Each structure stands twice: as C-alpha cells, then as structure tokens.
C-alpha cells in the first residue's frame, strides 16, 4: 500500500476507477478501491472515474477481475472472488460455449481445476480460512476439509487449536473420506488429527544392481512398472 500511495502522491491515479450509478442516487465504486484508499492517504480529494450502467453480475465480474491479480491477495480472498465470479457468470448464462470454470480461469491465467479447488476452499469456515491464510493449514488440506459439514469443520478447528497440530494431506484425506460416508465423529476427528504420522520410508535402487536384469532396450518407466508388478505379485502370494 505504501508504494501505491507514494506513486499516487507523485504522479496521481494513472488508471481510472470504475463506478456505476446507484438507484437511490450517488455512485458505487466497482474497481479502484486500493487507488481510492491510496489517494486518501496521499491527501488527494479527487481521482478519475469511469461511470457505466453495469448490472449486478457485470459489476461482480469487473470487481473480481480488478482484484484477483494482486500479488498480495490471500487464499481466502481468491477463493471468495472466484466463487463470486463463477456464480455471476452462471447467472448470466453461457455465451461463449466454454465451460464457466475455464472462462474464470482464463481471465486469471489459472486452469479450471485450480479454480474449482479455490471455489471448494471458499466453503471453509472463517476460522479455517484464516488458518490457510496464515499457513497454519495447507491449501490442499483446506480443500479436503471443505467437504466436511459445518459441525465437523468446527471439530477440526477446535482440535487444531487445542493440540497445535499440523494437518497432513493423509490426515485431511481421511477426514474427507469419513465425512463423505457420514461416519465422522468428534472422537474420530481427534483420533485422526492426533495420530502419530508414520515416517516416510525411501528406498533407492542403484543402477548397477538392477541393470543385469534388464537390457538397454528397457526404459526407466518400463523397469519401474515391472518391479512394481513383481512386488504386487509377491504381496498377493502372502509374502508381506
């Protein structure tokens, strides 16, 4: 905000804001809120504005597009913005023949899948969204938890605060799975979030030890698939 304020103090507002007339008189600012705030801080009493008669849906889309590219935008802000724009575009009806998620993503240079995940994230409670903003809860974990009921989300928030635990993707995946089946209880949430995370075991196979089993015609992917296939067969035979 300091950079914006200083720029306005030196050069003024270079890009006009966008507003629309209010039914009861006056104007509603649609885009340019940061420029307005920067102007006030810089001691300016006026800023350039373009006035258009936009519908509610058009105003929502313009507002989202003007804010979504901010470098400092929080995950919660982006989630709510994408949801607002998606709903506004759906309300308008399809005009281009494209998927609405694709259209939302194109304007923000993100793919439809990422946009969908942000929209799911918007279903989190305000408390959990704040945890995502402050990186106390990961984005992917937040998306998983967004599938839970409001009550179950409250359980998750309380236990995270109580235990100070970091939720892994494995744990959030379990919460989502049990939540979908309707089997999730407070006790189960507590058990899942407080269970000791198993240490990931890494095994490295040296090339000189396995090269004698494969000719040069095999690619690395083919070798990996064969090894996995043999291990699956070994497990099925009761070796593990």
Predicted regions and their residues:
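Alpha-helical interaction elements
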Residues: 69-150, 155
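Positively charged, structured surface patches that bind polyanionic biopolymers
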Residues: 54-58
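EF-Ts-like protein-protein interaction surfaces
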Residues: 123-126, 136-195
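Helical mechanochemical/support elements of P-loop NTPase systems and associated helical scaffolds
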Residues: 4, 34-35, 60, 75-78, ...
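Signal for well-folded cores of large energy- and translation-related assemblies
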Residues: 9, 13, 90, 120-123, ...
């Amino acid at each position: 905000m300091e950079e914006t304020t200083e720029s306005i103090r030196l050069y003024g507002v270079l890009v006009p804001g966008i507003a629309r007339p209010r039914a009861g008189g006056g104007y509603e600012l649609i885009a340019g809120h940061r420029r307005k705030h920067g102007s006030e801080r810089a001691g300016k009493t006026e800023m350039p504005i373009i006035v258009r008669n936009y519908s509610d849906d058009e105003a929502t889309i313009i507002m989202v597009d003007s804010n979504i590219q901010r470098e400092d935008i929080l995950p919660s802000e982006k989630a709510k913005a994408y949801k607002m724009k998606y709903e506004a575009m759906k309300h308008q009806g399809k005009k281009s023949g494209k998927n609405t998620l694709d259209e939302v993503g194109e304007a923000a240079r993100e793919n439809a899948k990422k946009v969908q995940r942000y929209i799911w994230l918007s279903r989190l409670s305000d408390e959990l969204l704040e945890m995502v903003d402050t990186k106390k809860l990961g984005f992917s974990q937040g998306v998983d938890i967004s599938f839970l009921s409001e009550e179950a989300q409250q359980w998750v928030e309380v236990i995270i605060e109580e235990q100070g635990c970091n939720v892994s993707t494995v744990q959030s995946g379990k919460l989502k799975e049990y939540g979908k089946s309707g089997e999730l209880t407070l006790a189960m949430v507590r058990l899942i979030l407080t269970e000791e995370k198993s240490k990931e075991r890494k095994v490295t196979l040296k090339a000189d030890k396995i090269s004698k089993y494969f000719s040069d015609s095999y690619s690395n992917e083919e070798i990996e698939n064969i090894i996995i296939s043999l291990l699956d067969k070994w497990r099925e035979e009761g070796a593990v």
